[in-house]
Amino acid sequence: KNDIFLAFKEAVSNSLEAIKSKKKLQPNYERASIVISVYAKSDTANEESFDYMIIKDNGIGLETKGFQRFCQYMNSSKGYNNKGTGRFFLLKSFKKAKYESSYLDEDGKYYDVYFDFSIENRANDLFINIISEGESSKTDSETSLMLLPFDCDKESIRRYNPFLNIDAVK
């Protein structure tokens, strides 16, 4: 039952790989960052519970080839010993994963892609719903992944990650 932790680890690992890929393309790139934000809500009994989490990086972005890889199970072309299985932890642990990504394409222009990855999208075999894609006004690449909602209580989170101070998250 470590699915939530594995999903979180997968998301952070993807951010680290995106930063590493950007450094290969831009050797002078030094502003690497990953920001993790966890949001909670109060229920009717005034108990805090997880509402959603956002993991944002300023790595390479989910460019066209990366998105095509994302759409193929067992595709190892990314490298880093990946096979495309980690995203299924997201499906099992969260109701929906919302991606917003900006990337620099081969034509020298920035593009945005917004899509949902969810069991709700089971009408297609990929579980993907593309919301929009097109040219961007941004001048740097980045990806935000919103994971919502957690389907467990505080004690479950403590059991999976005893180092997370859930009581401090408001």
Residue ranges and their predicted role:
Residues 77-170:
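GHKL-type ATPase core
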Residues 11, 37-41, 145-151:
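Short loop/turn segments at strand-loop or loop-helix junctions that form parts
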Residues 72-74:
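Mobile ATP-lid/nucleotide-binding loop of the nucleotide-binding subdomain
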Residues 2-36, 86-92:
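Conserved ATP-binding N-box helix of the HATPase_c
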Residues 35-37, 52-54, 98, 144-146:
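Beta-strand secondary-structure signal
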Residues 61-68:
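Short helix N-cap motif at coil->helix boundaries in the Bergerat
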Residues 39-53:
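Short beta-strand-loop-beta element adjacent to the nucleotide/active-site pocket used for signaling
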Residues 57:
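Acidic ATP/Mg2+-coordinating residue in the GHKL
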